């Protein structure tokens, strides 16, 4: 604000990995005030515990509606998972009925042919969950970057000052 820059989105995104009795309080623990927060997120490395993900999503969605702020899962995933229905069972199912604008999976590390590192949080060709990912991808509830309109080409006859 001091330099007159106003094209930032300020987000708060606490770690929420388990089922908590005070989920709302945990989401608001470091809340700086409504005037400072544009986006409410949570990092949720819930593993295969869909109860934790569902519970935290429910509270996140309710808080989002109360505060009139968009919300989403800013980081999630299960390292080196081998669950065939991970995408529809552990990610998509808990999201159903929640007003969550985005879910971001943690990274997949590049592994050269001679490495045996299993550091991945998302699908890759040939993974046991690849077919399930394609099912999730095809559902009307999911939206991927390829589904979005071109937002980065300046419209004709528009001048930015």
Language-model segments: what does each one mean?
Residues 1-25, 69-82, 105:
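Aromatic-lined carbohydrate-recognition surfaces of secreted/lumenal glycan-active proteins
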Residues 1-8, 33, 63-68, 147-157:
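A structural motif corresponding to the C-terminal end of an alpha-helix
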Residues 14-32, 51-63, 85-94:
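Alpha-helical scaffolding within the catalytic cores
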Residues 26-51, 106:
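Aromatic- and acid-rich polysaccharide-binding/catalytic face
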Residues 35-39, 68, 99:
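Glycine-enriched alpha-helix->loop->beta-strand junction motifs that scaffold or abut catalytic
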Residues 42-63, 67-69, 81:
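Substrate-binding surface in catalytic domains of secreted glycosidases
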Residues 69-161:
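Substrate-binding cleft of secreted/luminal carbohydrate-active enzymes
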């Amino acid at each position: 604000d001091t330099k007159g820059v106003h094209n930032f989105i300020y987000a708060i995104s606490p770690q929420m990995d388990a089922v908590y009795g005070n989920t709302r309080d945990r989401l608001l623990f470091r809340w700086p005030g409504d005037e400072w927060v544009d986006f409410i997120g949570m990092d949720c490395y819930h593993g295969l515990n869909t109860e934790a993900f569902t519970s935290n999503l429910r509270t996140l969605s309710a808080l989002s509606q109360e505060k009139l702020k968009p919300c989403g899962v800013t980081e999630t995933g299960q390292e080196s998972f081998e669950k065939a229905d991970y995408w529809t069972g552990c990610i998509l199912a808990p999201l159903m009925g929640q007003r969550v604008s985005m879910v971001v999976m943690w990274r997949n590390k590049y592994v050269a042919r001679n490495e045996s590192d299993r550091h991945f949080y998302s699908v890759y060709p040939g993974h046991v969950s690849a077919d399930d990912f394609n099912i999730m991808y095809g559902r009307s509830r999911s939206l991927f970057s390829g589904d979005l309109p071109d937002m980065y080409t300046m419209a004709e006859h528009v001048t930015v000052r």
